[in-house]
């Protein structure tokens, strides 16, 4: 997906997205070992998933989304993470009308 998708960069996240052939959108969250130990990576992934849930109903169908965490996300609070996700989704144009 990284080869065929488009990327958008933010200081704490990278979004790679592309259209899929199915009827549903899918999302994945990636936190590499560069983020920290397992506890830190899991904490980051939980925060990302929590924020993504707020916007998921508004994501148009047929998108594949991958959110890659950057090292700066460890110091970010939940509000900054949610703001970053919203910014990336809007810039990618994958958000539809609010439901």
Feature map (PLM): residue ranges:
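Positively charged, solvent-exposed patches that mediate nucleic-acid binding
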Residues: 1-99
């Amino acid at each position: 997906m990284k080869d065929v998708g488009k990327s958008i960069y933010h200081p704490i996240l990278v979004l790679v997205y592309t259209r899929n052939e199915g009827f549903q959108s899918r999302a994945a969250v990636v936190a590499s070992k560069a983020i920290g130990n397992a506890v830190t990576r899991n904490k980051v992934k939980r925060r990302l998933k929590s924020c993504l849930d707020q916007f998921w109903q508004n994501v148009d169908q047929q998108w594949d989304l991958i959110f890659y965490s950057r090292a700066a996300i460890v110091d970010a609070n939940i509000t900054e993470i949610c703001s970053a996700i919203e910014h990336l989704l809007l810039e990618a144009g994958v958000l539809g009308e609010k439901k």
